Curated annotation (Swiss-Prot):
Belongs to the class-V pyridoxal-phosphate-dependent aminotransferase family. NifS/IscS subfamily. The gene is iscS2. GO terms for molecular function: 2 iron, 2 sulfur cluster binding; cysteine desulfurase activity; metal ion binding; pyridoxal phosphate binding. Pyridoxal 5'-phosphate binds at T70, N149, S234. This is Cysteine desulfurase IscS 2. It comes from the Archaea. Its cofactor is pyridoxal 5'-phosphate. GO terms for cellular component: cytoplasm. The active site is at C321 (cysteine persulfide intermediate).
């Protein structure tokens, strides 16, 4: 098997699993309890919090643990907007954001907020001048990904931060970028930053929102007031410990790993683009080291994915969170592609356990798959 769907799901690193196990069977206390078991659990959560903050140079803020990146994005968008509505109700969101940002923004529109979507160019880069032009006295929030999870394009977040100059809060969804490129909240000027555990080989079902001390949010989940009152519900201690360990490993190893993945990525791109009428989606240079997003004329991405799976190669057509809808990717549509072009897309994402042999297998199988599918397409003519 050759797995090229690391953006959808990653395995838990064995070192992470080892760190988690004692908190499932031995140190199983509730962090809110006042006895020794609770103290040990509380101490473990705090240690993990510090490790996650350190990964993004987040000493100037706090980490709030959530059930994942989706909840963290909801907390950032809805929580910040609701808390700061008296300052204004104008929000800017990029057109290529994950649906866990776009749908909360749509929810806010129904609550009386005005949301404008920042357009992107053909490579998926946001138009910074649009942000500059649209900034108003009542603009309270701008939300932009650090890098796109589908096409891999890295956004000019530092430039955006300079344009904002503190006039509005900046939320950055760094789900796709942490562990792939440098993520430093001070350098990029983030007021809030979303991080996913599984995207750095930690357990699923846990994520975090880093929040600068000056940023004030309203909780979106109410209950016992855990996580400094911003996220109620007993903390998932084993998963949080695993998240912390994954952050610790990532901080030490990401640069070397990114360079290895970049080499594999470039090898795939160079060879796949030799196939007739194949095109790279996303920026040719400013892209994540693990991302290959290509489209093929005259065939559908779903057919390519199924054919590759039959050959023992796993890939995808886009975001796993919305790929079941069979709708064309809103990211690719925002980049100006036609419906049929967006439907012909194959997404290959590399990860920690990919090898040169995996790439060999992919490059051996893929050209034949494309040729076979095109031979059955009524649109294809040699």
């Amino acid at each position: 098997m050759a797995y090229f769907d690391y953006t959808s799901a990653k395995p838990v690193d064995e070192r992470v699993l080892e760190a988690m196990l004692p908190y499932m069977t031995e140190s199983f206390g509730n962090p809110s309890s006042v006895h020794s078991y609770g103290f040990k659990a509380r101490e473990a959560v705090q240690e993990a919090r510090e490790k996650v903050a350190k990964l993004v140079n987040g000493g100037g803020g706090t980490v709030v643990f959530t059930s994942g990146a989706t909840e963290a994005n909801n907390l950032a968008i809805i929580g910040y907007a609701m808390r700061n509505a008296r300052k204004g109700k104008h929000i800017l969101v990029s057109a290529v954001e994950h649906m866990s940002v776009i749908n909360p923004a749509k929810f806010l529109q129904k609550q009386g907020f005005e949301v404008e979507y920042i357009p992107v160019g053909k490579y998926g880069e946001v138009d910074v001048s649009f942000i500059d032009q649209k900034l108003r006295d009542d603009t309270i929030l701008v939300s932009v990904q650090h890098a796109n999870n589908e096409i891999g394009t890295i956004q000019p977040v530092e430039e955006i931060s300079e344009v904002l100059a503190g006039k509005a809060a900046l939320h950055i969804d760094a789900t796709a970028s942490v562990g792939q490129i440098e993520v430093d909240v001070e350098k990029i000027g983030a007021d809030m930053l979303t991080i996913s555990s599984n995207d750095i080989y930690g357990p699923k079902g846990v994520g975090a929102l880093w929040i600068r001390k000056e940023a004030k949010l309203q909780p979106v989940i109410l209950g016992g007031g855990q996580e400094n009152g911003l996220r109620s519900g007993s903390e998932n201690v084993p998963s949080i410990v695993g998240f912390g360990k994954a952050a610790e490993i990532t901080a030490m190893e990401w640069r070397e790993e990114a360079e290895r993945l970049r080499r594999l990525r470039d090898r795939i791109i160079d060879n796949v683009l030799k196939i007739e009428e194949s095109y790279l989606n996303g920026h040719p240079e400013k892209r994540l080291p693990n991302n290959v997003n290509v489209r093929f004329s005259y065939i559908e991405g779903e057919s390519i994915v199924l054919s590759l799976d039959m050959a023992g190669i796993q890939a995808s057509t886009g975001s796993a969170c919305s790929s079941k809808t069979l709708q064309p990717s809103h990211v690719l549509m925002a980049c100006g592609l036609k419906h049929e072009e967006a439907h012909g897309t194959l997404l290959l994402t590399l990860g920690r356990y990919n090898t040169d042999e995996d790439v060999d297998r992919l490059l051996e199988v893929l050209p034949g798959v494309i040729e076979r599918l095109r031979s059955m397409s009524p649109l294809y003519r040699r």
